[in-house]
């Protein structure tokens, strides 16, 4: 069956090359591939009438999305046909292309065309399909804001153009949130979007709280509709075998009911919005987020009333759905053989372990980073343990490239932003001569990209890696002591994990076995707090999560499976 359900005009299929003219070899899809974390497969929808200043229901625009907190500058290009129920957005000059078809029955269809690098080093394209559901339909995705509530506040010269400046300003106590749009053109004539800046949670893209800026160019209301919405020829698309909510990111859902207005609940939600700078674009999204917040807040309050050894707190994730939280976890399962070396058990005989250890105090750990909307936790755990090993060898802390692993390690079973494994990343590093520094390869993009490892200078070479024996905390402590930070995996699916704040985390609902692990983190130490032994974990969900990005995880009962799949590298 053809992958795309919508009709195409004869002779209007798109050529198999990206916007830079690079050609791609086409491979048949893998018979089995992992579940996707598809935040980019479904989009925020905007109503056709963007009053008081309408951009029209059909438009094409390109630009750059800047996320200062994630250190990302991401070029994009978008084609939107609201009335036709279809949109296409491509990132990094066509490296990744997403399509949304909201009119495809019954609940819309989304596609993601992404680059992949084969074992032979060839750049190929893969296509993945996600069907919308009644609960999570696929919507048209807009890259322009809904301007309801904006007012003209002045005029500025920006980017060589005279612009009208529109703002929607909200005061939150001592803080204020300002949403600003620069439009070129007269007040009564055609307007061209130039820049949209917002501080807070982005209702357009659904990522972490931050300051976002979209700079637009080449806005037009005319483009070849059918051609631009045709999937590339000769790239078969495969659906997800077992669709889960994480594959249908909750973006502007249709709600079947309207909650009653409760003054106390409204006040709690407003305080959350004040604290985290939230701004919602329309009444439907506001209600949706308020409900998410209330359900999560009730869970947090109930947990804290039980006086457990760790506390939860509302954070930047409190208005998220379970599906959106699941998208932050990117560990895959694999049937590939693990080539790790056996652990040197003889070293356990007469080892004298310190009572506590924290590699941060010795300068072996880079700052906490934000994986953004990419399921790349495995790459952060991999680079973290390599950075520590390199520090122990040379005395220098060199940030290594997660992006290189995301772009290049497909041939060993990793799937870029849709998940991977640390030991498969080790196999790729060892087989390809090493791993580059972040400075040499280029900045982290939070998106799949085309591999260009041959143009980078390698910063570390790998002789092998060691699998730490599972369920053996003494062996894990020894590995941490002698080899630096260790890559570990945990079950991060309990809701309490998302809202951890402080104390020693112990969650009976956490899985303990290998098959229950779903998130990779970096083990940087261990210790004792009020009689409770803990592991010190570094996460990649930004410093806004946990205790400045870190967690104290109980050693008791191998909670969350931290000792089930630990590895460390051996450098050349």
What are these regions (language model features)?
Residues 3, 24, 33-86, 118-126, ...:
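N-terminal leader/targeting segments and the immediate start of mature chains
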Residues 61-66, 87-92, 163-172, 196-202, ...:
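Short beta-strand segments that buttress and anchor functional surface loops
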Residues 75-140, 197-210:
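An acidic-aromatic
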Residues 41-50, 146-149, 158-159, 172-174, ...:
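Non-transmembrane domains of secretory- and envelope-associated proteins
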Residues 43-55, 105-177:
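Flexible, processing/modification-adjacent segments and terminal tails
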């Amino acid at each position: 069956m053809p992958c795309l359900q919508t009709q195409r005009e004869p002779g209007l299929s798109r050529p198999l090359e990206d916007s830079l003219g690079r050609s791609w070899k086409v491979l048949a899809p893998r018979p089995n591939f992992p579940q996707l974390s598809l935040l980019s497969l479904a989009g925020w929808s905007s109503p056709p009438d963007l009053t008081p200043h309408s951009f029209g229901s059909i438009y094409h625009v390109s630009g750059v999305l800047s996320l200062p907190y994630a250190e990302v500058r991401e070029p994009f290009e978008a084609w939107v046909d609201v009335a036709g129920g279809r949109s296409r957005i491509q990132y990094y000059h066509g490296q990744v292309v997403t399509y949304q078809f909201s009119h495809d029955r019954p609940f819309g269809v989304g596609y993601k065309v992404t680059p992949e690098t084969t074992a032979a080093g060839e750049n190929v394209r893969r296509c993945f399909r996600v069907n919308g559901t009644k609960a999570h339909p696929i919507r048209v995705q807009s890259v322009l804001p809904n301007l309801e509530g904006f007012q003209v506040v002045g005029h500025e010269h920006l980017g060589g153009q005279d612009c009208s400046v529109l703002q929607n300003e909200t005061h939150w106590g001592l803080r204020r949130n300002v949403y600003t749009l620069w439009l070129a053109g007269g007040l009564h004539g055609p307007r061209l979007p130039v820049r949209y800046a917002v501080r807070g949670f982005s209702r357009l893209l659904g990522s972490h709280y931050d300051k976002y800026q979209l700079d637009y160019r080449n806005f037009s209301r005319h483009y070849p509709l059918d051609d631009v919405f045709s999937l590339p020829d000769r790239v078969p698309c495969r659906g997800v075998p077992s669709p889960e909510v994480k594959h249908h990111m909750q973006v502007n859902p249709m709600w079947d009911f309207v909650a009653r207005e409760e003054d106390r609940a409204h006040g709690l939600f407003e305080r959350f919005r004040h604290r985290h700078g939230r701004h919602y674009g329309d009444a439907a999204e506001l209600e949706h987020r308020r409900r998410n917040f209330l359900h999560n807040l009730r869970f947090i309050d109930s947990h804290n009333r039980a006086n457990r050894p760790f506390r939860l707190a509302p954070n930047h994730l409190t208005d998220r759905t379970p599906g959106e939280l699941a998208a932050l976890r990117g560990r895959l399962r694999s049937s590939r053989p693990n080539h790790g070396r056996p652990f040197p058990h003889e070293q356990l005989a007469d080892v004298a372990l310190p009572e506590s250890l924290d590699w941060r105090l010795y300068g072996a750990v880079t700052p906490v980073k934000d994986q953004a909307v990419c399921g790349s936790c495995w790459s952060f755990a991999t680079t973290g343990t390599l950075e520590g090993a390199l520090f122990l060898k040379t005395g220098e802390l060199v940030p290594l490239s997660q992006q290189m692993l995301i772009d290049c390690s497909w041939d060993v079973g990793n799937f870029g932003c849709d998940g991977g494994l640390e030991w498969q990343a080790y196999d790729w590093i060892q087989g390809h001569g090493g791993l580059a520094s972040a400075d040499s390869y280029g900045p982290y993009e939070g998106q799949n990209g085309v591999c260009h490892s041959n143009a980078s200078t390698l910063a570390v070479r790998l002789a092998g890696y060691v699998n730490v024996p599972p369920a053996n905390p003494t062996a894990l402590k020894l590995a941490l002591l002698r080899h630096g930070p260790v890559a570990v995996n945990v079950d991060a699916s309990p809701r309490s994990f998302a809202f951890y704040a402080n104390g020693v985390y112990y969650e009976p609902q956490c899985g303990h076995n290998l098959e229950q692990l779903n998130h990779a983190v970096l083990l940087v130490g261990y210790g004792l707090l009020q009689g409770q032994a803990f592991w010190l974990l570094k996460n990649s969900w930004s410093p806004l999560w946990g205790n400045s990005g870190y967690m104290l995880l109980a050693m008791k009962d191998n909670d969350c499976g931290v000792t089930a799949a630990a590895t460390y590298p051996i450098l050349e």
